[in-house]
Amino acid sequence: YVVTDASKKTVSYRKAANKKIKSAAIPATVKVKANGVAYSFRVTDISAKAFAGCSKLKKVTIGKNVVSIGKEAFSKAKALKKITIKTTTLKKVGKNAIKGIYKKAKISCGKKKLKAYKKLFNAKTGYKKSMKLTK
């Protein structure tokens, strides 16, 4: 994680610790200790290429505070079959963010945001018609 704004207490998920992970969960918040004091930071974005090339990754859960997904964040994660989006504030999905994931992948986002997220996940992000965006 990288602190993006100390005053607003926000961080960005930078990169998967291991390219061979099978599942990942981007939490809503993370605790950071500094000088013996624990601080809570909201995870507001997923950096570019955070999970790029994680060929064994099958499942991702995106936390409720994520506002943006960087370009090529999940590119070439060819086994990625399920993305669960818990956030209702997602505003940006970067170019080729899901390019090269499983061709019949399911992206679930909840009933309230289905229409809005259909606009975010498009051909520029790597979304294919064989994929499903569901509630």
Predicted regions and their residues:
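Structural signature of tandem-repeat unit edges
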Residues: 3-8, 19-45, 54-68, 78-92, ...
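GGW-centered surface loops in extracellular recognition modules
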Residues: 1-17, 121, 126
